[in-house]
């Protein structure tokens, strides 16, 4: 199975192709296309579970699309830093982190739709979705440790902490029209920026 970003690569690379904002992204995708395809296959395996509902919920969200930016960023960063070994499992750590956070966010925010489909909790219920999100986060931490060692595990734990604190801040300030720029920036730093930083 190809990554959703894989389809961007050919258009941005052939001679004479018009340059667009996505051209650099397409070039990046092409550099790690094999790793992206491997990570996509690996992600399906990592979402497997002896508990059928956990697997079904994980696949429901993962199969609904998404750009797979976290695996792409991981692969490009690793290659730029000179890493030459296999990357698929490490790439999946960031995507599992993202999937777990999306499952949790939709429950916390009462999301009705995700990626053009009913949000997972509308189909499977809040408790099962929250716990599946926990499984995704735990597997991300395990993968980080297995693939990159204790420093990566600590970094991923820091990111999960930042994201969770950002979500609490967002809840505390929900609906406030007097929200200052500093609080807004703190929320997005803890949520989106922390996730991308992994």
Q: PLM features: residue spans?
A:
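Mg2+-dependent prenyl diphosphate-binding active-site environment of isoprenoid biosynthetic enzymes
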Residues: 31, 37-38, 44-198
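N-terminal amphipathic/basic leader segments beginning at the initiator methionine
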Residues: 1-44
């Amino acid at each position: 199975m190809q990554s959703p970003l894989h389809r961007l690569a050919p258009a941005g690379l052939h001679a004479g192709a018009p340059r667009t904002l996505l051209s650099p992204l397409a070039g990046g995708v092409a550099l790690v296309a094999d790793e992206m395809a491997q990570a996509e296959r690996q992600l399906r395996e990592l979402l497997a579970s002896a508990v059928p509902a956990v697997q079904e919920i994980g696949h429901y969200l993962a199969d609904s699309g998404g750009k797979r930016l976290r695996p792409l960023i991981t692969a490009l960063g690793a290659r730029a830093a000179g890493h030459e070994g296999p990357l698929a499992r490490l790439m999946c750590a960031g995507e599992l982190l993202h999937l777990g956070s999306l499952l949790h966010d939709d429950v916390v925010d009462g999301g009705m739709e995700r990626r053009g489909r009913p949000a997972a909790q509308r189909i499977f219920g809040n408790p099962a979705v929250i716990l599946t999100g926990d499984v995704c986060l735990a597997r991300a931490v395990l993968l980080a440790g297995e693939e990159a060692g204790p420093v990566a595990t600590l970094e991923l734990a820091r990111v999960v902490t930042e994201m969770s604190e950002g979500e609490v801040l967002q809840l505390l300030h929900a609906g406030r029209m007097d929200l200052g720029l500093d609080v807004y920036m703190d929320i997005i730093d803890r949520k989106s920026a922390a996730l991308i930083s992994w």
